[in-house]
Amino acid sequence: MTKLIVGLGNPGDKYFETKHNVGFMLVDKLCKDLNLKFTVDKIFQSEIASTFLNGEKIYFIKPTTFMNESGKAVHALLTYYGLEVEDLLVIYDDLDMEVGKIRLRAKGSAGGHNGIKSIIKHIGTQDFKRVKIGIGRPKEGMTVVHHVLGKFDRDDYITILNTLDKVDNAVNYYLQSGNFEQAMQKYNG
C-alpha cells in the first residue's frame, strides 16, 4: 500500500506560518520528525518527501500551486502513483472551528474551503480522508481573506503548536495502525 499525505497551504515566505498554512506546518513537522527532506517537483507542482513506514510507501506533499489550485497537484500525483482516493489524507485549516480544535473526517463537503473545493473538482469526489485544524473566525470588521492570510497572534500560535503535536500523533497513529476510523475515535474532540 501507498499513502499520499497532503498538507494544504500557499508557497513562499510571504505565507510562512499564516493561518491558511497550517496544513504545510503539519506536513513540515511530520517530515522533520522523520528526518525527511523535501524536493521540489515542477512537473507535479509540489514539494515531495517520502519514506517507508511498516512496509508502506508514504508520500508527504505540499502543493506549490497556491491553495485554490491544490486539486491539480493532488489529482496528478494520485494518477501518477496509481493511487485511489482511499489512499489520500488531506490536512488543512478550518475557520469555522475554534483555534486549535481538530476534526478527523472520512469524507465531507468543502465547507467553503477553496483548496478542498479544488481537490473535489479535480478528483471527482468528496469521499477522502481529511484532518481539519481550527483557526477561528475573523474578528469583527476583518475580511476572511485578511484573516486566513494573516499570522497567528502569540496566544493562538502557542495553541496551534500544541495542536500540531496532537495532529502529528493522530496522523502517525493512522499511518501505524492503518485504521482511520480508530484514529477518528481516539483524536476527535
From Swiss-Prot:
E.C. designation(s): 3.1.1.29
HAMAP family reported in the protein's UniProt record: Pept_tRNA_hydro_bact
Subcellular location as annotated: Cytoplasm
GO biological process, one term: rescue of stalled ribosome
SUPFAM superfamilies: Peptidyl-tRNA hydrolase-like (SSF53178)
Pfam families, alphabetized: Pept_tRNA_hydro (PF01195)
Family to which the UniProt record says this protein belongs: Belongs to the PTH family.
GO MF assignments: peptidyl-tRNA hydrolase activity; tRNA binding
Domain of life: Bacteria
SUBUNIT field: Monomer.
Annotated protein name in UniProt: Peptidyl-tRNA hydrolase
Coiled coil (residue ranges): none
Organism from which the protein derives: Streptococcus gordonii (strain Challis / ATCC 35105 / BCRC 15272 / CH1 / DL1 / V288)
GO cellular component: cytoplasm
